[in-house]
Amino acid sequence: MQVIKLLPIFAVANDKQKPTIFTLYGYRFMFYSNDHEPIHVHAIKGNSRAKFDLFPTVALVSSSGVKAHELRLLEQIVVENREHIIEQWLIYFNSDRRYERN
């Protein structure tokens, strides 16, 4: 798996409506500025999209235009970066929400 350097969201966010957490394999892992709980992440590349919930564990919610092998890769990336994604969500939404670390 490709190694990524995780940056604070404000260091890589170039679109205030769609804050980017990181990009990998051409996918932009992000959320929308008006997103809602449960905490989740969107992976977007062109017209390919997938959405993963992070609680209680990582789970695919929806996808469009993503091949099965890419979905497995995206899920693995989200699992491996779950803590960072949650941390960035809480920072961005200025939340002191507590959550169970799995």
Where are these regions (language model features)?
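Generic preference for hydrophobic/aromatic residues in regular secondary structure cores
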Residues: 21, 59-63, 81, 98
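Compositionally biased, intrinsically disordered low-complexity segments enriched
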Residues: 4, 38, 42-44, 83, ...
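Short, positively charged and aromatic/hydrophobic N-terminal segments
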Residues: 5-9
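N-terminal first-folded block
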Residues: 10-43
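A short, structured beta-strand/loop element
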Residues: 32-68
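Aromatic side chains
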Residues: 27-32, 52, 89-93
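C-terminal structural segments of small proteins and small subunits
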Residues: 72-102
